[in-house]
Amino acid sequence: ALDFTHAAARKVKTPKYLLGQRDKYTATGIGLALQYDSRDFAPNPYRGLYLNLRETYFPAALGSTETIWRTTFTGNFYQRLWKGCTLAFDAYMEYNTGKEIPWSMVAQLGGGYRMRGYYLGQYRDNGMIEVQAEFRQKIYNRHGIAVWVGAGNVFPSFDRFQWRQTLPNYGIGYRWEFKHRVNVRIDYGRGKHGGSVVFNVNEAF
């Protein structure tokens, strides 16, 4: 697989946030992925297992500003408990190594799929681990709800991982099935310093 990224910061009001790095970076990578997927329906699984391990190499020889290795792992498990109810688990890890990881390439915690309640990039570092468990229940006709709990952590390296910096996450959501097994979701997630609302199509994972 090929991966290309170009990022440029413009009109930076607080240059110190760049930590002395350049205001633009380019990265071109080649990668290899191993995947196993037994989900019954990817956009809204009721049962099954999804595993994906990906390694991507961004060498200077391909035009990358910095030479970087990126490892990502996704593990999802789904189990039907009773009629209309699914229990879903999600685990995600991203780890970037190199002499210097550009601000545009670090792992970013938050967003509309994991750690809902934190905006994307609210916490960022070379490495990130996130886990969540979600209970999904259809209530009546096309209407349903979801509740979840989760946690996440960012860290510069595995040997500097600190449990006390783990961030909590929990929330509740409404589901409307606008066609068979395809949901519109409205989620309200809470984090350490507040919350946010997410509107999207299909489940978070």
Residue map of PLM features:
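Repeated loop/turn-to-beta-strand initiation elements of outer-membrane beta-barrel proteins
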Residues: F41-P43, W82-L87, N141-I145, W176-V184
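Outer-membrane beta-barrel translocator domains and adjoining extracellular loop/strand segments
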Residues: H6-T14, P45-R47, G63-W69, E100-A107, ...
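Transmembrane beta-barrel domains of Gram-negative outer membranes and organellar outer membranes
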Residues: A1-T26, I30
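Flexible, solvent-exposed coil segments and beta strand-coil junctions
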Residues: A8-L18, L49-Y57, A107-R116, A151-V154, ...
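C-terminal hydrophobic structural anchor segments
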Residues: R136-L167
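C-terminal outer-membrane beta-barrel translocator/porin domains of Gram-negative envelope proteins
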Residues: G20-D23, I30-Q35, R39-K138
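Transmembrane beta-barrel strands of outer-membrane/channel proteins
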Residues: A1-F4, L49-Y57, F73, F89-Y95, ...
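Outer-membrane beta-barrel "beta-signal"
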Residues: G31, G112, I172-K179, G194-F205
